[in-house]
Amino acid sequence: MRCPYCGHLEDRVVDSRETQDGQATRRRRACLSCERRFTTYERIEDVLPQVVKKDGRREAFDRAKIVEGVATACQKRPVSTEQVEALVSAVERQVQELGEREIRTAVIGEAVMQRLRTLDEVAYVRFASVYRAFRDVGEFMTELAGLARKDGEER
């Protein structure tokens, strides 16, 4: 494994364990050159469906895009990297279980929002504001009112 800090190709595994969802192996590694530590995740490569974008373009399912979007929404929130990984793994599993050859971005986005809402409501609102591309403050306020209403019903 190439060290992300110095580029050296040799390292040693310091710790190895399964992630919470059991879908990957998390490994802490130490570079044999610069001695800095870094984390890698190992998972089985699955055949995932093509993603159909809003404009009709198709591209390969990209887990990293979902991780990036969720991590951005969770910035400065009490959400760990492991929680982000678990959320993305759950979405990825849901997509696989559908068994479709193609999936619309809307299905993926809704799955992410559903899980984010239970994880952290502020992160949910951040993600929804970008994903749903609110045109004005009124649409944003409507979403917040819906969130508050659903919270009231759950309590």
Swiss-Prot record:
PROSITE patterns: ATP_CONE (PS51161)
Transmembrane segments: none
Source organism superkingdom: Bacteria
GO molecular function, one term: ATP binding
Named cofactor requirement(s): Zn(2+)
GO biological process: negative regulation of DNA-templated transcription
InterPro entries, sorted: ATP-cone_dom, NrdR-like_N, RNR_NrdR-like
Keyword line: ATP-binding, DNA-binding, Metal-binding, Nucleotide-binding, Repressor, Transcription, Transcription regulation, Zinc, Zinc-finger
Record note on cofactor: Binds 1 zinc ion.
ZnF (unnamed) ranges: 3-34
Domain ATP-cone, residue spans: 49-139
Signal peptide: none
Family according to the record: Belongs to the NrdR family.
UniProt xrefs under PANTHER family: TRANSCRIPTIONAL REPRESSOR NRDR
Biological function: Negatively regulates transcription of bacterial ribonucleotide reductase nrd genes and operons by binding to NrdR-boxes.
Protein name per Swiss-Prot or TrEMBL: Transcriptional repressor NrdR
Underlying gene: nrdR
